[in-house]
Amino acid sequence: DKERTVENIVEETRAALKKSNIKGPYILMPHSISGIYSLYYANNYSEEVKAIIGIDPTLPQMSEYFGDDVFPTMPKYTEYMAPIGIARLLAYVTPDNILPLSEKGTYTEVNLKMAKSIVAAKYINKAVVKETNEIKNNFDLTTNMTFPSDLPVMIFTPKEQYVEGKSKIDFYNTQLQNIKNNKLVVLEGQHYLHWTHYKEMSENLNEFVEGLK
């Protein structure tokens, strides 16, 4: 029931790793909003982070770079979508909105059925609503943080163009320019690149990690 602040999320992650007896330093692999959490983790516990490999990660400077200061929010009633069965209904009526975008045969029917079940049980739950409503505060808290210059960072980004010629490619390059060991991998696709480019990403990931030894 804790608030979904970046501080709480990172501390819970650290506690889970410790309780599971998983020893650091760790290679963090954030996707989307967890980019904020990995940035906070690396800035506050640098000795615990060996590298960061991001999949289209959200970073606090995005808001200013793209001129977008509108942050998503969710009304409290949405946290009841799973308990009263609305999430289950959506999972089966509009499966294309929640199942991985991938070539036919990539996932087995068992995998897809499991994905539907997870969505039905967890989709827009209480924690998700709280986390969404905390995004602006988490942005504000990390707005002056950048990747440490001695921290290896690789980012996978979709090839997307935005208004006035700005793109995620340009943005991520600005974030990586002062990092000694960095790599930006551009892929055709959407936000969930790991659904469609898992093979290419695995090759790049293994090569990058091998170079850290």
Task: Please give the residue ranges for each predicted region.
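Short aromatic-enriched loop/helix-cap "lid" or pocket-rim segments at secondary-structure transitions
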Residues: 1, 63-69, 73, 167-168, ...
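Short, hydrophobic alpha-helix immediately C-terminal to the catalytic nucleophile
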Residues: 14, 39-43, 202-206
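Conserved hydrolase catalytic core segment
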Residues: 24-66
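A catalytic-pocket lid/entrance helix-loop region that shapes and gates access to the active site
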Residues: 58-90
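Catalytic histidine-centered segment of alpha/beta-hydrolase-like enzymes
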Residues: 184-199
